[in-house]
Each structure stands twice: as C-alpha cells, then as structure tokens.
From Swiss-Prot:
Negative results: does not block voltage-gated potassium channel Kv1.1/KCNA1, intermediate conductance calcium-activated potassium channel KCa3.1/KCNN4 or the Shaker IR (with inactivation domain removed). One of its GO terms (molecular function) is toxin activity. GO terms for cellular component: extracellular region. Blocks human voltage-gated potassium channel Kv1.2/KCNA2 (IC(50)=3.6 nM) and Kv1.3/KCNA3 (IC(50)=72 nM). This is Potassium channel toxin alpha-KTx 10.4. Its main location: secreted.
Length: 33
C-alpha cells in the first residue's frame, strides 16, 4: 500500500494522535509533533 501523508495524518488525528508520518511507505502515528 502506498502511504499518502495527508491521509495518514488525518487518520492518526482521528484516532487521537498528534500527527502521522510516512516511514518506508507505511503510516506511523505519533503522540507528539
């Protein structure tokens, strides 16, 4: 699957995380910026 930054970030925020980033084409959620 291709990680799209905007989608990843929005998905992470909806799950209560601070932000999301694409690492090795995978979405990673972070509790901090």
């Amino acid at each position: 699957a291709v990680c799209v930054y905007r989608t990843c970030d929005k998905d992470c925020k909806r799950r209560g995380y601070r932000s999301g980033k694409c690492i090795n084409n995978a979405c990673k959620c972070y509790p901090y910026a």
